[in-house]
């Protein structure tokens, strides 16, 4: 190995010893595997961010996080590809960064596993109440994710005629009506009796959905089915349990496959935030 390396070096006599110097331009530093991986991640994150922004409808600006991730991955790739820079960094700092990265990955994996564990949640028949969590209501009707929730709720309500339904959701600045009003009209037009539909039109978050809806039922006695999209069921159930719902079951509706990575990442941060402030 040393003999092969010497072929690329220039001998220089000094103090009766031969010192080998690198020829300029003859050898280039190889990119590390880590640098290549982070560069690929940066490109994928940027492409996904642009795809959501240009071609998909989105209800929040959370997709911009993918752009931020692209920048972070790009910077990490740049640092890893500079061997001299890496050598100058303190060993303790590099060890701490690696440990934090591994712990972060483990935390992310555990939380995402919990989210996935409720992807196929089903509910037993005969519930007293159903709560449908609101989502964006557009000028031409429910958004994709909300329509999936309403259709899943409709299936259950048709099979369980004694179950009442609470449609929960306020009105955003870009919504023509409150989410509750829109859902009320959607379900009534689909054949659900109006007297079975209760409106809660003040909430602006999942926590408020459940808190405000609790005044319309007895959360200590009533059996309640919570309808939301698959990626959202785990957090919804845990928030309800923490709030005192004694008999709560999630009912998972499908979600938009192309938006699933974005929704899963958003749920991760949502769970971490709710856990941090004591709501979970």
Language model: regions and residue ranges:
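Membrane-water interface of alpha-helical transmembrane segments
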Residues: 28-39, 60-64, 87-98
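Short, positively charged and aromatic/hydrophobic N-terminal segments
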Residues: 3, 9-10, 14-21
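Structural signature of transmembrane alpha-helix termini at the membrane-water interface
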Residues: 47-54, 75-82, 106-117, 272-279
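A transmembrane-helix-recognition feature enriched in membrane-embedded lipid enzymes
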Residues: 260-280
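Hydrophobic membrane-insertion alpha-helices, especially the h-region
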Residues: 96-110
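Membrane-embedded alpha-helical segments of integral membrane proteins
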Residues: 33-81
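A structural signal for short, hydrophobic/glycine-enriched beta-strand patches
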Residues: 110-264
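Cytosolic-side transmembrane helix boundary signature
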Residues: 68-100
